[in-house]
A protein has these predicted regions:
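Small/polar loops that bind or transfer phosphate-bearing groups
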Residues: 7-8, 82, 105
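N-terminal glycine-rich "phosphate-gripper" loop used for MgATP/nucleotide binding
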Residues: 75-91
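General structural feature for long, well-ordered alpha-helical segments within catalytic domains
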Residues: 15, 19, 61-64, 68, ...
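Non-catalytic positions within long, well-ordered alpha-helices that form the structural scaffold/packing
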Residues: 66, 70-76
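Short, acidic/small-residue loops that bind anionic groups at enzyme active sites
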Residues: 31-33, 94-105
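N-terminal glycine-rich anion-binding loop in soluble enzyme alpha/beta folds
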Residues: 2-60
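Short, flexible loop segments at the rims of nucleotide/cofactor-binding pockets, characterized by
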Residues: 56-61, 79, 99-103
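Metal-dependent catalytic neighborhoods of phosphoester/phosphodiester hydrolases
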Residues: 51-52, 89-97
Length: 105
């Protein structure tokens, strides 16, 4: 049984599109229905991760990422991924708040 993948995007909009393309290209599919069911939330309003890491008085991106994960789960995602190296600095806080697994890079 295939799982539905939720992608928290916008933390590098091109990275979001790149991972989507790679998932399609690397899936061994002979027809459309063989592909991974994917839900993408390309949320470009997520505060700058690097700015917050360098200066914790800046806006914390974690609550927005957690909210996006919750939206994806509500939409049917059974596993979450975030195509952003910097966002994984906050992996523990994001994963702890998600009822579904969050893939780590």
């Amino acid at each position: 049984m295939k799982k539905t993948l939720g992608i928290i995007g916008g933390v590098g909009p091109l990275a979001t599109m790149f991972i989507g393309e790679m998932i399609v290209r690397l899936t061994r599919a002979t027809k459309d229905q063989d592909h991974v069911h994917t839900i993408i939330d390309n949320d470009t309003s997520i505060p700058d991760r690097t700015a917050y890491i360098l200066d914790p008085t800046k806006e914390n991106p974690v609550p927005v990422i957690q909210k996006d994960a919750a939206k994806l789960v509500a939409a049917g995602a059974e596993v979450i991924c975030i195509p952003c190296n910097t966002a994984h600095t906050f992996y523990d806080d994001i994963a702890k708040a998600s009822p579904m697994p969050v893939l780590h890079m």
